[in-house]
Amino acid sequence: MKNIVFDLGGVLFARDKSKCTPELLEFFSFLRTPRMPLFWEEYDRGTSTLEEVTATISGMTGRPVETCAAVLRLAVDLQEPVKPTERLVGDLKAAGYRLYVLSNMSREFIDFLRRFPVYGLFDGEVVSCEEHTVKPEPRIYEILLERYGLTPSETLFIDDREMNIEAAAALGAYGITFSLHNT
């Protein structure tokens, strides 16, 4: 194995639940499903805006748009590195592995996460909002493999969604389904 590819949300970064208000935890309950809702997937794809997503969530929840916008801002601001994964990234880099990011992520989230020092340890990235394709669609994996000249059989994907690992395996790569409960 030469290349290790990390997902971001739920693998390298997460909201510390002890810092989240009950409202925030309840607000994002729609994300705790095997597949993301279509409106959120389009947000990650970069084909819908923060304003559109905020309006959709407002309509779903009956909460004012301003409240939904504030909760979304808080959701971004509370992202922080998952300490065991952050240490693993550092250890793998020190051991000479090539490290990459492959993540479904909106512009607001990725711009915030790129500010963390651990992000500088990666050799490359493919982020859904910049490529207009999302996992588990094969194209986003192909972009990563082609852009960085990665051989699938030498590449390990770490993701918190089984369907994304299955998509990597379909291209000949290896995968580990990650769980924050095991950190």
PLM feature segments, named:
Residues 20-21, 53-57, 72-75, 109, ...:
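Hydrophobic alpha-helical core bundles mediating ligand binding, dimerization, or RNAP-core interactions
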